[in-house]
Curated annotation (Swiss-Prot):
Reaction(s) this enzyme catalyzes, per UniProt: a 1,2-diacyl-sn-glycero-3-phospho-L-serine + H(+) = a 1,2-diacyl-sn-glycero-3-phosphoethanolamine + CO2
Modified sites of kind Pyruvic acid (Ser): S183
Record's subunit section: Heterodimer of a large membrane-associated beta subunit and a small pyruvoyl-containing alpha subunit.
BP GO terms, sorted: phosphatidylethanolamine biosynthetic process
Family: Belongs to the phosphatidylserine decarboxylase family. PSD-A subfamily.
Protein name listed in UniProt: Phosphatidylserine decarboxylase proenzyme
Ribonucleoprotein is among the record's keywords: no
Native species: Neisseria gonorrhoeae (strain ATCC 700825 / FA 1090)
Record PTM: Is synthesized initially as an inactive proenzyme. Formation of the active enzyme involves a self-maturation process in which the active site pyruvoyl group is generated from an internal serine residue via an autocatalytic post-translational modification. Two non-identical subunits are generated from the proenzyme in this reaction, and the pyruvate is formed at the N-terminus of the alpha chain, which is derived from the carboxyl end of the proenzyme.
GO MF term set: phosphatidylserine decarboxylase activity
Membrane spanning residue stretches: none
Gene that encodes the chain: psd
Protein EC: 4.1.1.65
Entry membrane topology: Peripheral membrane protein
Pathway the protein takes part in: Phospholipid metabolism; phosphatidylethanolamine biosynthesis; phosphatidylethanolamine from CDP-diacylglycerol: step 2/2
C-alpha cells in the first residue's frame, strides 16, 4: 500500500472533473430531464477513467513490475538515451480505458528526473519515445541496479504529472505520477534483465511482472541477451516451427492414405 497515497479508489486528479460532472448532471436533470443524459455519460466515463484500485503487489526482489495497465508494444534491445548504455526496452501503451495512475516498478531511489518538451503524436508509434513530451525517472534499485522509466504524452494526453524528485525513495507499487487520456510508458532495464512479456500482451499495473532483473550485474553474454530479447519480441517463431512440422506430418499421412 502506498504510504503517501492510500488509494481512495478514484484518483485525486479526477476529483474536480467528476465533482463538476456530477453537479452539472444533477442540475440539468432537474431542469431538462432526459437532456441530462450526455452529462451522465460523461460523468460515468470520468469515473472509470480516473479509477485507481489498490492491488496485491508481488514481493519477489528480482521482479520488475509493470508501472501501468496497458498493452506491450515494444520488447527489444535498445539504447537508453538517458544513460547512454545498452538496455532492454519494454514499452506499454495505455488507451483511454486503462488505469492511468503510474506506480514504481521496484524498490528504488530516484537519482534524477528529466523533463523534455515535445510533440503529441500517437503514443502507440515508436517515434513517440523520442519526439513526444516526456518525463524520465532515473533510479537505482535496492540492490544497486540502474533502471529508467519514462512517462510519454500522447495524441490526447497533454499533461504529464510526476510527484517524485531526485533523492526520493520509492517502494514497489508506490504511486509517483499520472497521465491523462491515453499515453505510454517506456522502461529501460539492464541488458541482463529477462523479459517476461511479449509484444501484444496485456499487462496490469503492479500485478504483471515485466522482467526479472538479477540482484547483481551478471555480465551475461551479449549474444545470449540479444537472443532472449529477440525471442520475447517475436513470440510466434516457435509456434511457426511447430505448425510447419505438423503440416509436414499431415502431408506424409495423406500420402500414405493415398497409396
Amino acid at each position: 500500500m502506498n504510504r503517501l497515497y492510500p488509494h481512495p479508489i478514484i484518483a485525486r486528479e479526477g476529483w474536480p472533473i467528476i465533482g463538476g460532472g456530477l453537479a452539472l448532471s444533477l442540475l440539468v436533470s432537474m431542469c431538462c430531464g432526459w437532456w441530462s443524459l450526455p452529462f451522465w455519460v460523461f460523468t460515468v466515463f470520468a469515473l472509470q477513467f480516473f479509477r485507481d484500485p489498490a492491488r496485491e503487489i508481488p514481493q519477489n526482489p528480482e521482479a520488475v513490475l509493470s508501472p501501468v495497465d496497458g498493452r506491450i508494444v515494444v520488447v527489444e534491445r535498445a539504447r537508453d538515451p538517458y544513460r547512454d548504455v545498452d538496455a532492454l526496452k519494454i514499452s506499454i501503451f495505455m488507451n483511454v480505458f486503462n488505469v492511468h495512475s503510474q506506480k514504481s516498478p521496484a524498490d528504488c531511489t530516484v537519482t534524477k528526473v528529466v523533463y523534455n518538451k515535445g510533440k503529441f503524436v500517437n503514443a502507440d508509434l515508436d517515434k513517440a519515445s523520442t519526439e513526444n513530451e516526456r518525463n524520465a525517472v532515473l533510479a537505482t534499485t535496492a540492490s544497486g541496479r540502474e533502471i529508467t522509466f519514462v512517462q510519454v504524452a500522447g495524441l490526447v494526453a497533454r499533461r504529464i504529472l510526476c510527484y517524485t524528485q531526485a533523492g526520493a525513495k520509492l517502494s514497489r507499487g508506490e504511486r509517483y505520477g499520472f497521465i491523462r487520456f491515453g499515453s505510454r510508458v517506456d522502461m529501460y532495464l539492464p541488458v541482463d534483465a529477462q523479459a517476461q512479456v511479449a509484444i501484444g500482451d496485456k499487462v496490469t499495473g503492479v500485478k504483471t511482472v515485466l522482467a526479472r532483473l538479477p540482484l547483481t550485474d551478471s555480465q551475461a553474454d551479449p549474444v545470449s541477451q540479444a537472443a532472449s530479447v529477440e525471442t520475447a519480441a517475436n513470440p510466434s517463431a516457435e509456434q511457426q516451427q511447430i505448425e510447419a512440422a505438423a503440416a509436414k506430418i499431415q502431408a506424409a499421412v495423406q500420402d500414405v492414405l493415398k497409396d
